């Protein structure tokens, strides 16, 4: 936050009473920051079917078939792939949704988040 001090001096009633002297008025101006962003990443494994990964990308990250396939192949070939960049709360929710969905379907797919 930024602080601005304004000093006002003045005399009233002859200058020797309680109404004379210096007054400091502090005005505070809040400075907002953009929230930190987090990358949501899928990790490759040898057991989760490629079709399931594509389905996850379409369902939870609103990717079209071409983008989902491209990301899935990147995960398959490089071991990790980015699904999207979100604020902390959204990223945390996406990771939780993907992990729960993978467990429900008995796949070991891992999804993590990291600060960008």
Swiss-Prot record:
The superkingdom listed in its UniProt entry is Bacteria
| Compositional bias (Polar residues) | 1-11
Q: What's the source species' lineage?
A: Bacteria, Pseudomonadati, Pseudomonadota, Alphaproteobacteria, Hyphomicrobiales
> How is the quaternary structure described?
Binds to the N-terminal domain of the chaperone ClpA.
What task does this protein carry out?
Answer: Involved in the modulation of the specificity of the ClpAP-mediated ATP-dependent protein degradation.
Provide the GO biological process annotations.
protein catabolic process; proteolysis
Where do the segments described as Disordered lie? 1-23
HAMAP family per the UniProt record, alphabetical = ClpS
- Which organism was this protein described from? Brucella melitensis biotype 2 (strain ATCC 23457)
**What protein am I looking at?**
ATP-dependent Clp protease adapter protein ClpS
């Amino acid at each position: 936050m930024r602080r601005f001090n304004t000093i006002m001096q003045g005399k009233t009633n002859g200058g020797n009473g309680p109404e004379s002297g210096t007054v400091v008025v502090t005005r505070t101006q809040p400075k907002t920051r953009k929230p930190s962003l987090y990358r949501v990443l899928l990790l490759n494994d040898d057991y989760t079917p490629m079709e399931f990964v594509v389905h996850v990308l379409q369902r939870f990250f609103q990717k079209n078939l071409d983008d989902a396939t491209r990301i899935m192949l990147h995960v398959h070939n490089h071991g990790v792939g980015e699904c999207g960049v979100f604020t902390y709360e959204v990223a945390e929710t996406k990771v939780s949704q993907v992990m729960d969905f993978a467990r429900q379907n008995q796949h070991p797919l891992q999804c993590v988040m990291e600060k960008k």
